[in-house]
């Protein structure tokens, strides 16, 4: 039997699942217009577009070393906003966190 090694430059099914868990609600609410995948020998990337914009705004990439990077594009160019050795780590900036609630005793003391 021949076993073919999975390329470090490609997203795994788990990586895609992590990404689409974040993307689907944003697309359903109309915040994101679409996601396009581009694959090459140098890496795999998902490009996120916003409604009424003709260019991608976010890029989630896995390079040939297996490193994940999340990029944001403003009018000045691409800026890294996250990176990690796993997709979960890299995408953590988009994970919702529970709101911080100040205990009632501290609120009263502040006044």
Identify what each model region corresponds to.
Residues 47-48, 54, 71, 92:
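Compositionally biased amphipathic helical and low-complexity segments enriched in hydrophobic
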């Amino acid at each position: 039997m021949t076993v073919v090694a999975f390329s470090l430059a490609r997203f795994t099914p788990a990586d895609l699942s992590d990404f689409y868990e974040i993307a689907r609600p944003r697309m359903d609410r109309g915040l994101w217009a679409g996601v396009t995948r581009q694959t090459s020998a140098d890496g795999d990337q998902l490009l996120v577009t916003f409604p009424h914009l003709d260019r991608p705004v976010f890029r989630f990439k896995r390079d040939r070393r297996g490193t994940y990077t999340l990029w944001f594009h403003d009018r000045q160019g691409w800026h890294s906003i996250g990176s990690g050795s796993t997709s979960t780590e890299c995408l953590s900036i988009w994970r919702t966190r529970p709101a911080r609630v100040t205990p009632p005793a501290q609120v009263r003391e502040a006044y």
